[in-house]
Each structure stands twice: as structure tokens, then as C-alpha cells.
Amino acid sequence: MNIKQFFVPAGKPLSGLAVGLSIFLTALFLVNNLVYPINEHLLLKPDSLFKFDLNRISLYPLAHLSFFHLFFNVISTFSMIVMFEESHGTLYTGVILNLLAVFTAIPYCLIGSLLFPNVEIGGASGWFFSFLGYFAVKESRVRNSVMITSTFSFPTLYFPVALLFVTALLAPGSSLPGHAIGLLLGYFMGLKENWVAKITPPSFVLKKIETWVDPLINLIPFGIKYYREVEVDRSLEYTSVYLGSESRLPLHNTDTPAEPTFQGNGRVLGN
């Protein structure tokens, strides 16, 4: 697998939301530590749902508690957002990020009010697990397993679950319930993406919004791509993030050597 493709698809500029969000998260972290403790108004509390505190319910992914917390979340979510944004559009991806935050917060608050009423959470790692679950569903339809070593493979669909528990072991202070809820939402989004589309604004609304803010979109620097609604087609089939000869694996063993297959021009997700 070509890891570079996760960050900078060949011959393509960086995606606008992925870059902008990374910069914004960093700026908020600096403001919180140097200017004003903004995290006090962003961290999600289990009682936030019952107080109808919309700031905390939707904005808690923006709050980070340490530099390493910020660094690992920016690095892990960047590639996921790049891939999703390229195939779904910048504005639509922003809507999805907000929906994921809200629909993760609701069950977290319900569970947390009973089991851990005094625990606050923040950070974008829930987004990472949601997108990880989403891409695992899509990838599992192309590759049923991922090669870990030359002799050991792991089911593609359950790889995020393994990573969920590894993360809990390596970072015991992280929110396992929040990550698990985010992962379940990602699985749901991958399995029922047409259902998710029904709770997002219609395409014509997104196009209208982009028309209104077009002067601002045109200010985006060269080398950073804003994927407009008119440029994307969310009905296109998923393309594996694995490149070259690994892009498809057989689902069963065969005793006869496979005949050479035509190697067409591959494309990165969303092209």
C-alpha cells in the first residue's frame, strides 16, 4: 500500500477541509493554552445533553487537552478526511463531521450520566474511528482481509475493532466509550450510506450555499482544493485505497495459476 496516497493523492492538491480543520484545531489549542481557556466551554459533559448545551454537544471534537493529543488526532484524521472529502465534497464532509459529533455525543451522554457522570471528553479521535469504520466497510467489499505479516492476515471489517482496543491499552486515559460509539456510527455510515444522505441537506441546498460563499472559496490559496458540490458524484463505486496488484485479493484459494490480468489506469478514491 502506498501510504503517501493517504495524505497527498498523486498529482492532486491537498483538500480544503482537511487542511483548514488541521490549522483551526491547532489555533484553538494555542488560544486555549496561551490566551483564554476555551476548552471550558467545549468539553463534552454527560449532563450536556440534558442542559441542551449545543456548544458542547457539537463542538467537543475541537477541544484538545495536550500537544500530543492534538498531534495524534490531526495526523490520524487528516488522511481520512482527505479521502472522504475528495469523493463527497468539502461542504458535505463538513456536514457529516458535525452529524458524527452530535450522534456520538447523544449516546455518550445517556450512558455517561449513569456510569461516569463527572468525566469530560474532547478531541477529534471519535471522527477518526468513525471514518475508520466507514472505510473498513467499503474496503471489506474489495478485500476481505488485510495482510499484517507475510503469513498472517486479519479480517478487514474487524481491523478497526482491534485498533480500538489497542488504543485503549496504549492510551488508558482515552475515552473507550466515545471511540466505540464513533466506530459504530462509522460502520453504520458505511453500510447504510443512503440512509445517512437522507438526513443531510439536499445537494441543491449545498450548491446554493456554495454560490453564496463563492467569493470566500476563491480566496483559498493555490495548492489547496475545495471540492465543490457540482464536482463530486457520491454515487460512484468505492475504489480501494490499496494500489497496484494488491488492490484486489481472491476470496478463496485456487490451485491453478492466475492468468495475467489487464492492468488499467487505477484511480485514487473519489476520482
Curated annotation (Swiss-Prot):
It is a multi-pass membrane protein. Belongs to the peptidase S54 family. GO terms for cellular component: Golgi membrane. GO terms for biological process: proteolysis. It catalyses: Cleaves type-1 transmembrane domains using a catalytic dyad composed of serine and histidine that are contributed by different transmembrane domains. The chain crosses the membrane at residues 16-36, 64-84, 89-111, 115-137, 152-172, 176-196. Its EC number is 3.4.21.105. This is Rhomboid-type serine protease 2. SUPFAM superfamilies: Rhomboid-like. Probable rhomboid-type serine protease that catalyzes intramembrane proteolysis.
